[in-house]
């Protein structure tokens, strides 16, 4: 199992969904910014979590630190290849205030 910890900001409000058995989850996307050799790079992570109690706080721009299981899937859509980076969150921590234009 691959574990990862990321820190970044939500690019949109978290959304609730139910799996096929009816269990409730939330999902959101986190942008992690990194500067290498003077260039800004952003990596996006799709996060799923079963702890929905903090849902009301997970709004666009909110800073989060997420630790969980990492999965990577290669996707070929309309002749274009790309990679989805997914994290199933075990731990979730909020930090800072929501950034207005995140």
What is each model feature region?
Residues 1-102:
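Single-stranded nucleic acid-binding surfaces, predominantly the OB-fold ssDNA-binding core
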């Amino acid at each position: 199992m691959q574990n990862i910890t990321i820190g970044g900001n939500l690019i949109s409000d978290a959304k609730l969904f139910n799996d096929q058995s009816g269990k409730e989850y939330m999902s959101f996307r986190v942008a992690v910014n990194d500067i290498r050799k003077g260039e800004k790079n952003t990596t996006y992570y799709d996060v799923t979590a079963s702890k929905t109690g903090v849902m009301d706080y997970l709004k666009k721009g909110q800073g989060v630190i997420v630790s969980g299981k990492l999965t990577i899937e290669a996707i070929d859509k309309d002749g274009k290849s790309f990679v989805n980076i997914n994290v199933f969150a075990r731990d979730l921590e909020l930090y800072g205030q929501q950034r207005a234009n995140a």
